[in-house]
């Protein structure tokens, strides 16, 4: 699902180098989805569910994923902020699961976490380039941070036990 917010920026990236970088990241994120889908498929077998059932649940809204994957990316700074801070938060939460007792999940996370480090570095590079740019580019960074901050914090859990995914 990590590819959803950034895929729009593949054709809009400001340079060929940036286009290749974001394209590689989106491709990695699609691979992460495939790895995790295989793990989920295996866990669903005892319940008689298939990949098709899972996809139907996703498309109809019965099954959801983290709210950041539903947010639009309005600017190039958003693409950078996702890589730098959202993928950075994912690294923190996912590395805590590297020792999971379920082997297929632990193995998938090893690859995912290794690749997420590159994604965070890529995002940081975008943000640093914008920070060294014009006042408008720096304002774009601030707007992006303001937009993504609250959803980013949800990677670490809700603010209180009264907070839910629909709050």
For the regions a language model picked out, list residue spans one by one.
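Helix-loop segments that flank and shape redox-cofactor active sites
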Residues: 2-24, 90-105
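Structural signal for well-ordered, non-membrane alpha-helices
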Residues: 3, 7, 30, 34-37, ...
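His/Met- and acidic-residue-enriched segments that coordinate or traffic transition-metal cofactors
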Residues: 6-7, 20, 28, 37, ...
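Short, glycine/acidic-rich hinge or "gate" loops at secondary-structure transitions
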Residues: 17-20, 42-49, 134-135
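Conserved alpha-helical segments that form or flank metal/cofactor-binding pockets of metalloenzymes
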Residues: 25-57, 123-128
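Acidic/His metal-coordination segments adjacent to aromatic residues that form catalytic metal sites
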Residues: 55-83, 100, 133-137, 148-166
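Internal, conserved structured core segments that host functional sites
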Residues: 67-122
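A contiguous pocket-lining binding segment that forms or flanks enzyme active sites
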Residues: 104-166
